[in-house]
Amino acid sequence: MKRAMVLFALLLAVTGLIAGQAGATGGATAPAATARLQTLEQDVVSRLNATRVSRGLRPLALSDDLQSAAVSHSRSMLADGYFEHESRDGSPFFVRVKRYYAAAGFDTWSVGENLLYTTGEVSAAQVIKAWLDSPSHRENMLSPAWREVGIGALQASSAGGTFGGEQTLVVTMDFGSRSGGTGQKTVKLVKPKPNPRSTPAPPPVRRLLPVTIGV
């Protein structure tokens, strides 16, 4: 059977979210910072699923493979000071994702990606709202095609390059769907939280780059 592959990549930058809470994390290995970012990741996925369920869409299962792909990209962007879907070597995002979220053994395989960074702190509700307020990001989040998701939220007290040496928090969310063939894999389901309450509107979007590729 011919393999179908669909790729969606969307990129969003916002600045100044809850700027009064900004402060150095003390490094990626600081226990408090690690726990806080893990909580942010869990809350973003829970709110994503609550939003999908409220619109009659299935919640997404948390994939360890997509999680690894997302964390890897967030770490690379902070370390090398860039904000793009492409890897630092210029290879397209789906090549990176496929290293973790394999297509081999499946008849269909598709992936998508949303990115966000902020120079301040950000809540899960604000991440979801920023993406929902962007039509292209919203379309990615609410696509009925996706079955799995992974997220990587990382922060650096001083990130160079594009980030100008400022404290920066980067969020990568990778979406995926694969089916058929012999490569079926068991995944765990993230239970959605109730619909999030309204939050203050985030700052204007500074950059948006939607990409759609079909093979």
Regions found by a protein language model. Name each.
Residues 54-69, 81-91, 138-153:
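Surface-exposed patches in mature extracellular/periplasmic domains of secreted proteins
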Residues 19-21:
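N-terminal signal peptide c-region/cleavage motif recognized by signal peptidases
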Residues 3, 23-26, 117-215:
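Disulfide-stabilized extracellular recognition modules
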Residues 25-80:
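A short alpha-helix/helix-coil micro-patch that ends at or immediately precedes a cysteine
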Residues 39, 57, 92, 110-112, ...:
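Extracytoplasmic
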Residues 68-121, 143:
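Short, surface-exposed glycine/acidic/tryptophan-bearing loops
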Residues 7-17:
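Bacterial N-terminal signal peptides
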